[in-house]
Amino acid sequence: MHYCVLSAFLLLHLVTVALSLSTCSTLDMDQFMRKRIEAIRGQILSKLKLTSPPEDYPEPEEVPPEVISIYNSTRDLLQEKASRRAAACERERSDEEYYAKEVYKIDMPSFLPSENAIPPTFYRPYFRIVRFDVSSMEKNASNLVKAEFRVFRLQNPKARVPEQRIELYQILKSKDLTSPTQRYIDSKVVKTRAEGEWLSFDVTDAVHEWLHHKDRNLGFKISLHCPCCTFVPSNNYIIPNKSEELEARFAGIDGTSTYTSGDQKTIKSTRKKNSGKSPHLLLMLLPSYRLESQQSNRRKKRALDAAYCFRNVQDNCCLRPLYIDFKRDLGWKWIHEPKGYNANFCAGACPYLWSSDTQHSRVLSLYNTINPEASASPCCVSQDLEPLTILYYIGKTPKIEQLSNMIVKSCKCS
């Protein structure tokens, strides 16, 4: 009797060891892709809090330019962030709202004069002031998730220095002579003579303050990092510094200050070339009807370690390409832009060895034996995900939304 019990136990032990070496149940690639496509269908509707796709309406002959501008700015901003994370091997914040956020664009009032106007005679060589009217968003102040200030740096071939460190400040309302007049936000090193580029700054705190206290909205100041004095150790002298002029030029801010009143041709050319590049704010807000879901529907992501920044072996867990065409794969015509996107998915084997130092290895093996359909051993899953910006129509109303965690960028065994 004891011999039979012992034999049965040894057999069970060998079976569980064999099972513990396996990974998730394997799927053929076609089936895996079909499941991924259906998951994306449900994911998009869920993030938009829709139970079914909007009714099909005839596509508009022409999308309003301001709508396209918001869509392009949001898409470009996300691409810039993704490039920076890839270069530095970083991750986004661990807490990211699961549901889609509405995106609003607020342009800075144009400083370019009309054709017959005389350009302003004053010029601030050491800094620039940028102001925005956010009063229209005050009713949604509590829904603000993020605010980005974007300004396009122009190429300045006549710059006296090739590189400058520019700083962004929030202008403060002075209570008295001793109170600060500005608050530092961020800085960037720019190449003054290089091709133009978009610069982005996180100004969430400043805009949040403006939405709650309208009288504190005095705008932003772009200036140089310039210490007021230099200490000379050899003779203990303190030499006052002459302020360095701001050589960086910005679309929508600079352009008329150096022109004469007769240079109307240059003004016209500048206006046309820099069209769509004026400074603006991108505000991302969680709609009120999704605010309640924000607390209970967040997805947490692990921090990306340097160990994960490697090239996966093709046979093992790695990133697999998958392009989703909204019309072909989902049968949807209501998403205007983009027409599709690279969703990708994770697949491949995850080696899993029996280890005596695994605290619950025997428990997990027994669990596998009792429930072979479930997986207690590592599976190939998504690690880094990026958001997707879409432009769609509900009826004849255009809407722009940012959908988080839609693009799989890397995988891991977990």
Swiss-Prot record:
GO terms for biological process: cardiac epithelial to mesenchymal transition; cardiac muscle cell proliferation; cardioblast differentiation; cell migration; cell morphogenesis; cell-cell junction organization; collagen fibril organization; embryonic digestive tract development. GO terms for molecular function: amyloid-beta binding; cytokine activity; growth factor activity; protein homodimerization activity; signaling receptor binding; transforming growth factor beta receptor binding; type II transforming growth factor beta receptor binding; type III transforming growth factor beta receptor binding. CDD domains: TGF_beta_TGFB2. Interacts with the serine proteases, HTRA1 and HTRA3. Interacts with ASPN. Interacts with MFAP5. One of its GO terms (cellular component) is extracellular region. Belongs to the TGF-beta family. It holds the Pfam family TGFb_propeptide. The gene is TGFB2. Keywords: Cleavage on pair of basic residues, Disulfide bond, Extracellular matrix, Glycoprotein, Growth factor, Mitogen, Secreted, Signal. This is Transforming growth factor beta-2 proprotein. Residues 1-20 form the signal peptide. Glycans are attached at residues 72, 140, 241. Disulfide bonds join 309-318, 317-380, 346-411, 350-413. InterPro entries: Cystine-knot_cytokine, TGF-b_C, TGF-b_propeptide, TGF-beta, TGF-beta-rel, TGFb2, TGFb_CS.
